[in-house]
Amino acid sequence: MITPPLNPLRLPPLSLYIHIPWCVQKCPYCDFNSHAQKGTIPEQEYVRHLLTDLTADLSRYQESIQQRPLHSIFIGGGTPSLFSAENIAFLLHQIEQRIPFAPHIEITLEANPGTAEAERFLGYVQAGVNRISMGIQSFSDEKLQKLGRIHNAAEAKSAVGFARVSPLRSFNLDLMHGLPNQTLNEALDDLRQAIELAPPHLSWYQLTIEPNTMFAYRPPKLPDDDELWDIFEQGHQLLTAAGYQQYETSAYAKPSFQCQHNLNYWRFGDYLAIGCGAHGKLSFPNGKILRYSKTKHPKGYMRGEYLYEERDVSTEDRPFEFFMNRFRLLEAVPKNEFEQFTGLPLSAVDKTMAWALDQKFITETDRTWQVTEHGKLFLNELLEAFLPE
């Protein structure tokens, strides 16, 4: 029998994730819930379903949501920039009619450089979007072709130019390293070109081969572990020298430009989720923590079959779920947040923390835990120690 949490939960900040599943074509490395566009995308119909889905969630989970405003919205995909600014404006306006926005809400929209024009960027800003995340991935036309991207390097730089002169609050560039046959110099050249464009935020992550992707069926030749380490180490030095602060495993930002939406994920915050295959997490004052997901395929979703699955997060699973998120961040973890957001006493993790200290994976003060440089190298081993026996 599962022992209930000993303490009521403090409700964390609330975000909203919106999934738009269509893209121009499926990239060979992509394992996200995305569907290649065939004919005209039913934008208005899909937006209506998103709003119906949200309305149902606000009713179903009212005990959790209460009067909490949204601190961030992230519109991901797929390729959300395939949708018109008019439909994004209508969607955001209707969401605000249903749930209040916090005064400085961050609203991010993912964009593909191949679908970006100056007018479209301005339209998104007028719609209420204040942050754009662009999937650049590389500035090498050869590498972009191997990755199945629909844009080239010139289009990528042009799209970044639109973002820089727009009234956006911030923008992010997604860049990958460890690409097929990529050398150290090629990886660093990509990074230098990104830095020259001066984005406030850079997500710099390693390509991994995911199951059920084209790359999984036909694996390309990737850099080995030693080459990957050299790329990361020298790339990290480049970013730091350019004034970027690493605040998460793959995230770098200029001061005060961290992604608030992702910070809320990693700090074990709450997030509503609407759209095909979207995943949400909600806390309830009585101690319950719920995870849920939505129907993946657009056909089922647009039949009104929104909710796919719900599961309670057991007390045994909460330490792993909490630290799996928190230890991705480089900031110290406040002990009181573990108690407040999981409902568990500190004694629930005493043994594991003593082991982690002995292994020099973490340091500890009266108020915080902090992953060490050594601990970052063994992060998976550290996290596995929190799994229920």
What are these regions (language model features)?
Residues Y252, D366-W369:
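Short, Lys/Arg-rich nucleic-acid/phosphate-binding segment
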Residues T3-L6, L11-S15, S34-E63, R68-L344:
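C-terminal scaffold of the Radical SAM
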Residues P21-S34:
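Local cysteine-cluster metal-coordination motifs and their immediate loop/turn environment
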Residues K376-E389:
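Short, amphipathic alpha-helical interaction segments positioned at domain boundaries
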Residues W369-K376:
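Basic, amphipathic "hinge/linker" alpha-helix immediately C-terminal to the N-terminal HTH DNA-binding motif
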Residues G343-W355:
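Short amphipathic alpha-helical interaction segments
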Residues D358-R367:
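A short, conserved structural fragment
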